[in-house]
Amino acid sequence: MSYVVLVADRLTKSYDGQPALRELSFELQAGRVMGFLGPNGAGKTTAIRILTTILRPTSGRFVIDGVGSEDPARVRPRIGVLPETLGLPNQITGAEYIGYFAQLYGRRRADARRHGLATLELVGMRERAGRLIRTYSHGMRQRLGIARALINDPVVLFLDEPVAGLDPRGQLDLLALLRDIAKDRGTAIILCSHGLSEVEDACDDVLVLSEGRVVASGSVSDVLALARQRVSGTDLRIHVPTSAAERANATLRAIPAIESVRGGIVDGRLEVSLARGPDQAIEGTTNEILDQLLGDEIPVLGFEVEGSRLQDAFIELTEGRSS
């Protein structure tokens, strides 16, 4: 059963009277992955530094696994952190490196080695445990960093730009690993990133920051739906025979859910924008459009739905454009 492991309550941080973070509040459940998104200066880094006890908030508080931010010494054993820059030593092996950190958390040498190897196996690095770190690729180094962050069995794992610098396959593999860690171990994860696609692919929840404030939060689909109400553009691409393009245009313009129709006269390819409504379901609208076209005996050669991506939502929400 999922339960709340992190509660942030009106976290605020100011420098010389200028707020860098304004009343950040959210909850995170065990086994879920949350993405922090926002442009430079949005407050993401400040939020992470507060939640990992590097900074003290000007006001507000947070609780991790029942321990409040007033007691940072007890918070730290409950969290794991993968910083953007690792700074790994090159002249020792991965097993020696992880075993050292296991000993720092109170394990005896033999037990620390066993636990370290088990953690390396968890991140797919068991076979490379005996190699010197200087021989590791960038992806291996990131996995080693994740192993270090997991060595104390944290309740919440914080990752800053975890897939930066990886090739596309390496990114997908690492994101899959993070999802597995959350699902199989029940670890809550906060992923701070500028890479919108990785957040969309890996996260259950998204928190969008702009100028220190939360401008949107919820599941990925919730944030997309919120932005979708405000973003204009092409929703559908419909291909009909050129000979039927004028009839298709007239049919589409008569449908109340459609805001505009463009193109089609030359090549039969129509671009359709839907009218915006807070409760609009695009699936029902597309079914209505298809039924109407086919009912008017207009052949449909192609039908493509263009859903908003997180990139669109991010730009719309952080720039604050109105509909």
List each language-model region with its residue ranges.
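Conserved catalytic motifs of ABC-family nucleotide-binding domains
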Residues: D153
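Conserved ABC ATPase "signature" region
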Residues: G99, Q103, A110-R128
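Catalytic Walker B motif of ABC-type/P-loop ATPase nucleotide-binding domains
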Residues: L157-D160
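Hydrophobic anchor residue at the start of the ABC signature
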Residues: I146
